[in-house]
Amino acid sequence: MNNQGKNIIVWAVIFVFVILLFNVFQSDGLLSSKNNISFSEFLTKVDEKTVNSVKIQGRIIEGTSNDGSSFSTYAPDYPDLVNRLNNNDVNIEVVPPETRMNTFLSFLISWFPMLLLIGVWVFFMRQMHGGGKAMGFGKSKAKLLSDKGPKITFKDVAGIDEAKDELTEIVDFLRDPSKFQKLGGKIPKGCLLIGPPGTGKTLLAKAIAGEANVPFFSISGSDFVEMFVGVGASRVRDMFEQGKRNAPCIIFIDEIDAVGRHRGIGMGGGNDEREQTLNQMLVEMDGFEANEGVVIIAATNRPDVLDNALLRPGRFDRQITVSNPDIDGREKILQVHLKKVKYSTKIVPRIIARGTPGFSGAELANLVNEATLIAARRNKKEVEMHDLEEAKDKVMMGVERRSMIMSDEQKKLTAYHEGGHALVGLYCLASDPIHKATIIPRGRALGMVMRLPENDRFSMPRDKMEADIAVAMAGRVAEEIIFGKEKVTSGASSDIKMATRMAKAMVTDWGLSDKVGPVYHGSASEDMYTNRNSSSDRSESTSELIDEEVKKIVTTGYDLAKDILTKHLDQLHILAKALIEYETLSGQQIKNLLSSRQLDSEEENNFPFGAASSTIKIAEEKDLKKAKPIKAKKEDKS
């Protein structure tokens, strides 16, 4: 039973005890039901002279008969009672009314609010600090991983082999330190896992816990600092003391950026408390006292905000980058997650891996789970390839909103908008191949053209950037050509935003503007935590020049898209008409449609396709017999 359940039982027992105590006191002040007689019967006995003596206590009368039996009764307001008793020779004893009950009630009424507040405060303090030690604010919240339950090992980790090898060495050191110490090697004091969200940093830590036969403590960076001053530093000290007592051991700090940010940034007591906590952590990790056998493993997706003193060797000796997996890594990750579900032997993980560039391990796990839910919803006995393809489209493009009712005019406008994207993407050879075009609303978009690269891309060439900007502007251009400038809509807002950001990065980050030159100007968002590279460092003339160059690049892409769509207006009409009729077209179907001006009967009977291979390069001259592909224009250097 957990601590919360035990606390509830304790308070329930206390409540029942108070109720019983109240009843005991109450019963003492009430008339006993033993030998109780009515007041009329009592008067009759008095008149018959069978009553020997009575004791009057308020309204309660207790008496003794001549035969020695006792009785009791409750008297109403009867002024002549004493005279009647005297006339019948009854011995009378009068005592004051019982005041014990009133005193107890008065005590409860006066002290109950204060006792209630104290009880609530103690209860919450016990909840905050582990069910005991009500004054143990400074105790560490690090949890020792239990041996119970299924263990995660390195076999469950795939796609990040380099990071796994680095951490395997640490596990081997903890298991057999003599192997390394005989050459004079020392165990690394700390290891920092760096990478975007979902790449498997926490999973690696769990795998280390499953592999290493040493105590494993886990804590979050946000668990150190709370509302009381000095609590964070105290918890850091207690955590390392706990580690020393269990050495050799591993302490895992997740999201260390919550406590390890740059010092001296910001103002206020909360910030001072965080800095005090960080200072204590720096001392404990590499101070005068040795922490032999205590290995710190931390994870963060914001290494840029961490304090430099925390990152130096001697504290975090190793910084391991856990990046998104490549195509081979994605295939291995899919195989790991597919083992946990019932799937068809016809599934080819390599095809799904090829169509999910940039996916993290968490996103691939979610994709497999979505495919499983889709198969279960359709009462299938196993997950099939089509379910994975549909789940991929759902994750990448959003959920289909088929219930959304679109007017014919809106549907036509969306078809030409998406057709413009697809056609320009088809003719810009530097652009990624088209995976799918649809006018079915998905997420917040009324339609979408999905393009996927043939292979993993680790850098982006300039001609692809220019092609992507042209493809982004093609939707707005298609609306202007078909419906006129006065009829254009706000549907291109996200496209314009994407094109502007790309152009700005070309000028300020990548030095691709001849006028601005290969100078890094950075973005204003970088000064959030570091106060470096702020846009305010630029001169006014430089900012104006950057704006001019950004506008020039976007306008060049706009002109390229307009040139392509104007020359191939007939193909735009064909593509838009097919989108209106079938709603969804794969890249291969668009290729066949524009090369032969018709669809094969087999394709026509299977609309809409769930997905098509994203590895088909569709902008080829032999496939487009009536149109010559146009390459993206280079930026005017004048």
Curated annotation (Swiss-Prot):
Subcellular location: Cell inner membrane
Documented EC number(s): 3.4.24.-
Topology of this chain in the membrane: Multi-pass membrane protein
Keywords: ATP-binding, Cell inner membrane, Cell membrane, Hydrolase, Membrane, Metal-binding, Metalloprotease, Nucleotide-binding, Protease, Transmembrane, Transmembrane helix, Zinc
Cofactor(s) listed in the protein's UniProt record: Zn(2+)
Free-text comment on the cofactor: Binds 1 zinc ion per subunit.
Keyword Manganese listed: no
Active site (record annotation): 418
Span list, region Disordered: 523-544
Gene3D superfamilies: 1.10.8.60, 3.30.720.210, P-loop containing nucleotide triphosphate hydrolases, Peptidase M41
PROSITE patterns, sorted: AAA
Alphabetical list of Pfam families matching this protein: AAA, AAA_lid_3, FtsH_ext, Peptidase_M41
The keyword Repeat is assigned to this record: no
Residues binding Zn(2+): 417, 421, 495
Main function: Acts as a processive, ATP-dependent zinc metallopeptidase for both cytoplasmic and membrane proteins. Plays a role in the quality control of integral membrane proteins.
NCBIfam families: FtsH_fam
HAMAP family: FtsH
Family according to the record: In the central section; belongs to the AAA ATPase family.
PANTHER family: ATP-DEPENDENT ZINC METALLOPROTEASE YME1L1, METALLOPROTEASE M41 FTSH
Name this polypeptide is given: ATP-dependent zinc metalloprotease FtsH
